[in-house]
C-alpha cells in the first residue's frame, strides 16, 4: 500500500511542469525514504533526477518499495486539475495497475479524485557517481533563465566559462555574437540574489541551449540554481525543492568539431 499526502500540492505541479516536455514516460520509485524519479530524455542526451524526501510529506506510507510507470504528459494533465492551494494525495494498492490522485481544497469542501493507469516501462537505473567538480556556480534562477532565453535568440549553443573573475555565457550565430558575464557578488542583502563561484580550476564547456532552456522551466521551484561543471563530466543544473529534495538535470557537453577537420 502506498499513500503520500502533500500539503503543498503546487510543488508537485511545478515539478511535473519542469520535466514533462523533456521526458515522456518514467518510473516513479517509492521507498521508505522518499519518492524519486530518474529518466533520460527521448534523445538520450539529458538525464533528469528528482527526489522528494518522505519527511516533506504530511503523511507518507510506503509498505514496500514500489515502481510506478507513468506517462508524464498524462500525469501533468491530471495535476492541472488541482488548484494551487490543494492538498494532493497519491494512492496505489499493492499489485494494482492504477494510481489515484486525490485533490482536496484547503477548506475541505471540495474533493476530487482521478485514477490513472500505470505503464510497464523498462528503464535501467543509471548510477550517477558523486564527483568533484572543477567549478560550482550558484546564482539567481531567474537570472540564469533570462540569460539562456536571451542567448537562444542569437545562437543555439552556449559556452559557459568560469574563471576567478566570474562566469561568462557566450554564443555565436548567423547574426553575430553575445557574451554575458556575471561577477561574483556575495554582498547583496538577500542571499538568494547572490552569485557565488567556487572554482578549483578554470573550465569552459559548450552546451545545447534548447536543453538549458528546458531545464530553466524548474525556476519556479527555487530562487537559486546551482551549476556544477567539470571538463570531462556532464554539467549538473540543480534546483532545490523547498526543504524536500531537489531536481537535477545532467547534460553532456558538446564536443566542438575542429573547423579544418573536413579539409583534405
UniProtKB/Swiss-Prot annotation:
Family: Belongs to the PCNA family.
GO biological process, alphabetically ordered: leading strand elongation; mismatch repair; regulation of DNA replication; translesion synthesis
UniProt lineage: Eukaryota, Viridiplantae, Streptophyta, Embryophyta, Tracheophyta
Principal cellular location given in the protein's record: nucleus
Organism: Daucus carota (Wild carrot)
Function per UniProt: This protein is an auxiliary protein of DNA polymerase delta and is involved in the control of eukaryotic DNA replication by increasing the polymerase's processibility during elongation of the leading strand.
Coiled coil (UniProt feature): none
Compartment(s): Nucleus
Keyword Nucleotide-binding: no
DNA-binding region(s), residue ranges: 61-80
Entry keywords, A to Z: DNA replication, DNA-binding, Nucleus
The protein's name in its UniProt record: Proliferating cell nuclear antigen
This protein's record includes keyword Nucleus: yes
Cellular component GO terms, alphabetical: PCNA complex
HAMAP family the UniProt entry points to: DNApol_clamp_arch
Gene Ontology molecular function: any one: DNA polymerase processivity factor activity
Amino acid at each position: 500500500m502506498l499513500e503520500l499526502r502533500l500539503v503543498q500540492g503546487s510543488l508537485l505541479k511545478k515539478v511535473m511542469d519542469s520535466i514533462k516536455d523533456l521526458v515522456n514516460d518514467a518510473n516513479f520509485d517509492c521507498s521508505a525514504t522518499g519518492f524519486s524519479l530518474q529518466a533520460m530524455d527521448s534523445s538520450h542526451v539529458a538525464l533528469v533526477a528528482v527526489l522528494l524526501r518522505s519527511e516533506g510529506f504530511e503523511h507518507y506510507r510506503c509498505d514496500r518499495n514500489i515502481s510506478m510507470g507513468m506517462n508524464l504528459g498524462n500525469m501533468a494533465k491530471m495535476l492541472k486539475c488541482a488548484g494551487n492551494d490543494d492538498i494532493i494525495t497519491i494512492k496505489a494498492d499493492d499489485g494494482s495497475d492504477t494510481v489515484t490522485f486525490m485533490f482536496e481544497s484547503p477548506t475541505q469542501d471540495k474533493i476530487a479524485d482521478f485514477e490513472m493507469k500505470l505503464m510497464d516501462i523498462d528503464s535501467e537505473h543509471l548510477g550517477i557517481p558523486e564527483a568533484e567538480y572543477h567549478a560550482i556556480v550558484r546564482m539567481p534562477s531567474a537570472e540564469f533563465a533570462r540569460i539562456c532565453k536571451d542567448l537562444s535568440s542569437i545562437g543555439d549553443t552556449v559556452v559557459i566559462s568560469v574563471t576567478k573573475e566570474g562566469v561568462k555565457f557566450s554564443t555565436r550565430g548567423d547574426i553575430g555574437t553575445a557574451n554575458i558575464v556575471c561577477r561574483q557578488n556575495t554582498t547583496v542583502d538577500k542571499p538568494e540574489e547572490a552569485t557565488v563561484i567556487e572554482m578549483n580550476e578554470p573550465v569552459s564547456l559548450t552546451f545545447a541551449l534548447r536543453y538549458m532552456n528546458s531545464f530553466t522551466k524548474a525556476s519556479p521551484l527555487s530562487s537559486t540554481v546551482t551549476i556544477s561543471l567539470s571538463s570531462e563530466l556532464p554539467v549538473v543544473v540543480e534546483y532545490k525543492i523547498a526543504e524536500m529534495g531537489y531536481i537535477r538535470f545532467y547534460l553532456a557537453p558538446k564536443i566542438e568539431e575542429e573547423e579544418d577537420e573536413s579539409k583534405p
